[in-house]
Curated annotation (Swiss-Prot):
The organism of origin for this protein: Rhodopseudomonas palustris (strain ATCC BAA-98 / CGA009)
Annotated family: Belongs to the transferase hexapeptide repeat family.
Keywords: Acyltransferase, Amino-acid biosynthesis, Cytoplasm, Diaminopimelate biosynthesis, Lysine biosynthesis, Repeat, Transferase
EC numbers: 2.3.1.117
Principal place of residence: cytoplasm
Identification of the protein by name: 2,3,4,5-tetrahydropyridine-2,6-dicarboxylate N-succinyltransferase
Pathway: Amino-acid biosynthesis; L-lysine biosynthesis via DAP pathway; LL-2,6-diaminopimelate from (S)-tetrahydrodipicolinate (succinylase route): step 1/3
CDD domains noted in UniProt: LbH_THP_succinylT (cd03350)
Residues annotated to bind substrate: R108, D145
Reactions the enzyme catalyzes: (S)-2,3,4,5-tetrahydrodipicolinate + succinyl-CoA + H2O = (S)-2-succinylamino-6-oxoheptanedioate + CoA
Pfam families registered for this protein in UniProt: Hexapep_2 (PF14602), THDPS_N_2 (PF14805)
Assembly behavior: Homotrimer.
């Protein structure tokens, strides 16, 4: 089915989603399956960047993922530790894969790595024991380290390092919300969290424990400029606080969390300098 027909069918089905059930067959089921297969192969993605740097979200693909939950019944998923099973609606990306299929895909998935069907993993990526949710896109030569999470529909660029325990938030609902986007050559420090549609631009570095949501203030300590929802290219961020407003009795109010841009580097410096050196004040 051509992409335009897929999009139209899925949009119409989503508008009438209350009528879509596990018993639904025919064109709607086929359209959703086709869309999930295209996502799984990386032939389409939930969001893509244009030449100007703007990201466009393909909402119809998010709708396809949401419709799949209505179309698919719960079932036993084998492969748990100690012979245990799971009970879910979404199969593993690796279901039925053998040596040839893994070699063709060209990425590394160590024991304990969980990837749900419709997520795409590009060549030379490395997945340590981690979780990649449905509809996500992980580009070439990216490392998803131990206990890191890539949320539903998140977009991860090339040569990104997502450190141990870091969380990249997912988004399926509300439908109008955009996914978290980590552009090429970024470093996300251990136990950091990027959520609520934040965009981390090319080459940025987040120190350990940086938390970014849609309303988190990102303060450039040199210029005083404040960013919200987007980390500038090649910015180096550490956790910080902003002074709170005085309370009614005149006492200092509680400080609020923010992220602080401690420096900015160019592409050449970023490529030649270790992360530890960049984060050293």
């Amino acid at each position: 089915m051509p992409l335009t027909a897929l999009e139209s069918t899925i949009n119409a089905a989503f508008d009438a989603r209350d009528t879509v059930t596990a018993a639904t067959q025919g064109e709607i089921r086929q359209a959703v399956e086709d869309a999930l297969d295209l996502l799984d192969q990386g032939k389409v993605r939930v969001a893509q960047r244009d030449a100007s740097g703007a990201w466009t979200v393909n909402q119809w693909l998010k709708k396809a993922v949401l419709l799949s939950f209505r179309l698919n019944d719960m079932g036993v998923i084998a492969g748990g530790p100690g012979g245990a099973n799971w009970w879910d609606k979404v199969p593993s990306k690796f279901e039925g894969w053998g040596e040839n299929r893994f070699r063709e895909a060209g990425f590394r998935a160590v024991p304990g790595a969980i990837v749900r069907r419709s997520a795409f993993i590009a060549k030379n990526a490395v997945l340590m024991p981690s979780f990649v949710n449905l509809g996500a896109y992980v580009d070439e030569s990216t490392m998803v380290d131990t206990w890191a999470t890539v949320g539903s529909c998140a977009q991860i660029g090339k040569r990104v390092h997502i450190s141990g325990g870091a969380g990249i938030g997912g988004v399926l609902e509300p439908l109008q919300a955009g996914p978290v986007i980590i552009e090429d050559d970024c470093f996300i420090g251990a136990r950091s969290e990027v959520a609520e549609g934040v965009i981390v631009r090319k080459g940025a570095v987040l120190a350990m424990g940086v938390f970014l949501g849609a309303s988190t203030k990102i303060v450039d300590r040199e210029t005083g400029e404040v960013f919200v929802g987007e980390v500038p290219e090649y910015a180096v961020l550490v956790p910080g606080t902003l002074p709170g407003k005085p309370m009614k009795n005149g006492a200092p109010g509680p400080a609020t969390a923010c992220a602080v841009i401690v420096k900015r580097v160019d592409e050449r410096t970023r490529s030649k300098t270790s992360i530890n050196e960049l984060l050293r004040d």
